[in-house]
Swiss-Prot record:
The name this protein goes by in its record: Alginate biosynthesis protein AlgA
Catalyzed reactions per annotation: D-mannose 6-phosphate = D-fructose 6-phosphate; alpha-D-mannose 1-phosphate + GTP + H(+) = GDP-alpha-D-mannose + diphosphate
Names of required cofactors: Co(2+)
Gene3D superfamilies tied to this protein: Jelly Rolls, Spore Coat Polysaccharide Biosynthesis Protein SpsA, Chain A
Length: 481
């Protein structure tokens, strides 16, 4: 059995903590490990092979770093140039394996779900395996225990032809209003759609070709034209752009006669909203969940997430407060699904707060935007031991570098030299330059940019060990380097 872990979402409903360039699956929202790391660790038992990962190309360095940090293995990482939903993502994964002569059972898992009961998860997986081995396409259904309007529902019924504990899917139901959701719970036999599946690779491709040939044909061509770099598979962008955007549910599961459901009662949560974050955390005597430097007085059933500043909440009930360095979100717990509308409005205004945090992670380290004005920007840059930035130049800005700690190797035009703590240098406009850390401890510098234009699209990469010379820089204030 091979897990296929889908890591391509943007997590906009958990803004402002989740950003497009660092979405929720890569955040530690429910413990010390990120949701992505938890998902992989959950699969460490007999019979489970290393996972096949699917993620956005922009997130490849985050994925590799989080794997390395926990010494986690993967057999390949499929890099999507842009999202086309789950049906194409799984199609390319299945096609890759079948082409290699590995027609295995595929366990399809989103990278951002929480499952608290590992034993119950494995028991449900054993039931699903019995059905999938017989050619069925299994969906893991969460027994509908309350009238939830944020999930799609599955109606199931008994089928004597299926193994014990497995039911036939009768119909899929879109996210209902509360009245209809109450009817489903009262009637029984309804499940929330978890978005987790188990089926054989060839079975999925057979059903996909039958029910959505456009996705099948486009994905096959995109894979054939893909570029391989070690365990990275760069899916061909020009071909993939033509692929229809569709989910596994719409493309296959709602149309096939082989869809069945296995109940999963394992403390599942898709962590899809701030109210879900409140659900999965331990609460104080007044039902409050707090994180960070937070003071709560005479408040009940609130979620308060601080990220640096002191946050004080007084006399509130059922309120969510999330503070980050550059944004704050306050909402009633019943309205947190509407965060997506705020994100849409910010995107329409071209605001950078939906793209990056002030602290931006890169394959070489990170930088934090400390201050910014009309003709200047100040950054705190950290470079990992042995790492180096791209060889680059800027046409409209100069830079001043001051070493705070560690040793910097600086290239500026035809000169290469070392700087140590409290030393500084000046990089003129249009100079070809590079910053590297030759030492064994992190390098920290303060960078002061000045010039007529400070946009991060003013970067020309001439050489890059991370293969980014052909990629356009992000045209947002918090830039790319």
């Amino acid at each position: 059995m091979i897990p296929v872990i889908l890591s391509g979402g943007s997590g906009s409903r958990l803004w402002p903590l989740s950003r497009k360039q660092y979405p929720k699956q890569f955040l530690a929202l429910t413990g010390d490990d990120t949701l992505f790391q938890q998902t992989i660790k959950r699969l460490a038992f007999d019979g489970m092979q290393a996972p096949l990962l699917v993620c956005n190309k922009e997130h490849r360095f985050i994925v590799q770093e989080q794997l390395e940090a926990q010494n986690l293995a993967s057999q390949a990482i499929l890099l999507e140039p842009f999202g086309r939903n789950t049906a194409p993502a799984v199609a390319i994964a299945a096609m890759k394996l079948v082409a290699e002569g590995r027609d295995e059972l595929l366990l399809i898992l989103p990278a951002d779900h929480v499952i608290e009961d590992q034993r119950a998860f494995q028991q449900a997986l054993a039931l699903a395996t019995n059905a999938a081995e017989k050619g069925e396409m299994v969906l893991f259904g969460i027994p509908a225990s309350r009238p939830e309007t944020g999930y799609g529902y599955i109606r199931a019924s008994a089928d004597a032809q299926l193994p014990e504990g497995v039911s036939r899917v009768q119909s899929f139901v879109e996210k209902p209003d509360e009245a209809r959701a109450r009817e489903f719970v009262a009637a029984g036999g309804y499940y929330w759609n978890s978005g987790m599946f188990l089926f054989r690779a060839s079975r999925y491709l057979e059903e996909l070709k039958k029910h959505d040939a456009d996705i099948y044909d486009t994905c096959l061509l995109a894979l054939e034209r893909s570029q391989h770099d070690g365990d990275l598979v760069n899916i061909d962008a020009a071909t993939f752009e033509c692929c229809p955007d569709n989910s596994i549910d719409y493309a296959v599961m709602e149309k096939t006669s082989r869809a069945c459901v296995v109940p999963l009662s394992a403390g599942w949560n898709d962590v899809g909203s701030w109210s879900s974050i409140w659900d999965v955390h331990a609460k104080d005597a007044n039902g409050n969940v707090t994180k960070g430097d937070v003071l709560v007085h005479d408040s009940h059933n609130c979620l308060v997430h601080g990220n640096g500043k002191l946050v004080s909440v007084i006399g509130l009930e059922d309120i969510v407060v999330v503070e980050t360095k550059d944004a704050m979100m306050i909402a009633h717990k019943d309205r947190v699904q509407d965060v997506k509308h705020v994100v849409k409005d910010l995107d329409a205004q071209g605001r950078s707060e939906t793209q990056n945090h002030c602290e931006v992670y890169r394959p070489w380290g990170s930088y934090d935007s400390v201050d910014m004005g009309g003709r200047f920007q100040v950054k705190h840059i950290t470079v990992k031991p042995g790492a180096r930035l791209s060889l680059q130049m800027h046409h409209h800005r100069a830079e001043h570098w001051i070493v705070v700690s560690g040793t910097a190797q600086v290239t500026c035009d035809d000169k290469t030299f070392l700087l140590t703590e409290n030393q500084s240098t000046y990089i003129p406009i249009a100079s070809v330059h590079r910053l590297a850390n030759p030492g064994k401890i992190p390098l920290e510098i303060i960078e002061v940019q000045s010039g007529s234009y400070l946009g991060e699209d003013d970067i020309e990469r001439l050489e890059d060990v991370y293969g980014r010379t052909a990629e356009p820089a992000l045209q947002v204030v918090a830039g790319s380097r």
